[in-house]
């Protein structure tokens, strides 16, 4: 769990997202409160529940980007899901409890990655021994092994071809749920697990170079050193205390007045979410997960529906409400220039691989921002995503001819932007910009 202060979290988010300070502050405080709760003792720790968040704002204003950056920052089990992917229990499709099962799998991957780092040195020793066995045989004299060990460490044998034996992977075999028992204690059963347990792990011999063999051998040796039960227990503890779920497109499951049909299932999804957000126990194949202390952050554009169209009980379970503002021309200009990996920096880096030096003048940046705002106001407003469409249009010719212009410096100024796109922005027919 990250120990960043709210100010540091907001500062980190500022590197990638322009504006939306209210939303940044809300998620920063929520994340810090997770850390504060873990410092409490006994009964008080159990009583402090997370304050779930509802983010409301037009498309392309930064809701999903906040979630993406928060996931990297949190250092905790984090899952982003679209609410539209789920159906009411009894309908064909995934039920909402699958969110928690997926969160557990995410946590297991995280814990394994941490363990792998701590076991790396020990695993490397085992890999070295297995590579020596493949090179000189298990019964070779010690002097021969020592001689080859030195060559191996010096990197002289990296391209030598050897034959190694690896455990057969079973993870890609199909999985299924028990009939009539969604979320049963065993959850999804893997056919691969059944065969592995009944027949034992099968192995497969394969030929590869020493360099290529290192990675799969390291993964296998690390896996052998891990205590799987301890990893699962640690992952479950991490999910129950630090887990964060980001529910995107929550507005798409609102049941609107005067509408029937599919709205029945939408309202059912909301009802299924209620106990999950309030706190319940979800059975997974790794054990039972209590959701009381999992933080839920919901977001939606609410173009057609209103937040009040959500079930009152669900509104009550999302007590912190944050409104994100639509982006203006100045915001677009800052997005193009000030963010850590802005679109301009991305295009400059991409074309630099062809030996082309791309330069944008400040006037060109202002012109790009202005065109994006004009197009957004004329057709559907898709926020900052419009910049990608505009940039692609402006740099279409440069991207196409870049291999023939190696060593050149290409300056993009306001006149160049106007020439490639200005007349289209003034035209009422803007169909080519609609994504």
UniProtKB/Swiss-Prot annotation:
Annotated InterPro entries: AAA+_ATPase, ATP-dep_Clp_protease_ClpX, ATPase_AAA_core, Clp_ATPase_C, HslU, P-loop_NTPase
GO molecular function annotation: ATP binding; ATP hydrolysis activity; peptidase activity; proteasome-activating activity
SMART domains: AAA (SM00382), ClpB_D2-small (SM01086)
Residues bound to ATP: 18, 60-65, 248, 313, 385
A GO CC term attached to the entry: HslUV protease complex
Disulfide bonds listed in the record: none
A Pfam match: AAA
Compartments, as annotated in UniProt: Cytoplasm
GO biological process: one example: protein unfolding
Main location: cytoplasm
Keywords, comma-separated and alphabetical: ATP-binding, Chaperone, Cytoplasm, Nucleotide-binding, Stress response
NCBIfam families given in the database record: hslU, PRK05201.1
Family designation: Belongs to the ClpX chaperone family. HslU subfamily.
Assembly notes: A double ring-shaped homohexamer of HslV is capped on each side by a ring-shaped HslU homohexamer. The assembly of the HslU/HslV complex is dependent on binding of ATP.
Purpose: ATPase subunit of a proteasome-like degradation complex; this subunit has chaperone activity. The binding of ATP and its subsequent hydrolysis by HslU are essential for unfolding of protein substrates subsequently hydrolyzed by HslV. HslU recognizes the N-terminal part of its protein substrates and unfolds these before they are guided to HslV for hydrolysis.
Identification of the protein by name: ATP-dependent protease ATPase subunit HslU
Species this protein is from: Beijerinckia indica subsp. indica (strain ATCC 9039 / DSM 1715 / NCIMB 8712)
Name of the encoding gene: hslU
């Amino acid at each position: 769990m990250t120990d960043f202060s709210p100010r540091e979290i907001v500062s980190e988010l500022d590197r990638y997202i322009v504006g939306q300070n209210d939303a940044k502050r809300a998620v920063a405080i929520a994340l810090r409160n997770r850390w504060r709760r873990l410092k409490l003792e006994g009964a008080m720790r159990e009583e402090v529940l997370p304050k779930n968040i509802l983010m409301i704002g037009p498309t392309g204003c930064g809701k999903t980007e906040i979630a993406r950056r928060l996931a990297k920052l949190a250092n905790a089990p984090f899952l982003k899901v679209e609410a539209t992917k789920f159906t009411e229990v009894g309908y064909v499709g995934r039920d909402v409890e699958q969110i928690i099962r997926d969160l557990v799998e995410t946590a297991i991957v995280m814990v394994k990655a941490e363990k792998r780092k701590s076991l790396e040195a020990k695993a490397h020793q085992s890999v070295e021994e297995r590579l020596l066995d493949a090179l000189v045989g298990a019964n070779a004299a010690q002097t021969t092994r020592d001689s080859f060990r030195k060559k191996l460490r010096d990197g002289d044998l990296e391209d030598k071809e050897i034959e190694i034996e690896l455990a057969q992977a079973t993870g890609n075999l199909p999985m299924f749920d028990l009939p009539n028992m969604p979320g049963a204690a065993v959850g999804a059963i893997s056919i691969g697990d059944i065969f592995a347990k009944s027949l034992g792990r099968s192995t497969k011999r394969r030929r590869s170079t020493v360099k290529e063999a290192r990675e799969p051998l390291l993964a296998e040796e690390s896996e052998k050193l891990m205590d799987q039960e301890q990893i699962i227990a640690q992952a479950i503890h991490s999910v129950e205390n630090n887990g964060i779920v980001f529910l995107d497109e929550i507005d798409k499951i609102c049941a609107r007045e005067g509408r029937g049909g599919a709205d029945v299932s939408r309202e059912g999804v909301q009802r299924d979410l209620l106990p999950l957000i309030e706190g319940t126990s979800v059975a997974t194949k790794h054990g039972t997960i209590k959701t009381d202390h999992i933080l839920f952050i919901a977001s939606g554009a609410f173009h057609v529906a209103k937040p009040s169209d959500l079930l009152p009980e669900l509104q009550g379970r999302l007590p912190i409400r944050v409104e994100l503002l639509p982006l203006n021309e100045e915001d677009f200009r800052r997005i193009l220039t000030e963010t850590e990996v802005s679109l301009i920096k991305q295009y400059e880096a991409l074309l630099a691989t062809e030996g082309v030096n791309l330069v944008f003048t400040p006037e060109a940046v202002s012109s790009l921002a202005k065109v994006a705002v004009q197009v957004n106001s004329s057709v559907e407003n898709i926020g900052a995503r419009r910049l990608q469409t505009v940039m692609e249009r402006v740099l279409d010719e440069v991207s196409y001819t870049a291999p023939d212009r190696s060593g050149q410096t290409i300056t993009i100024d306001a006149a160049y932007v106007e020439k490639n796109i200005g007349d289209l922005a003034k035209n009422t027919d803007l169909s080519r910009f609609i994504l």
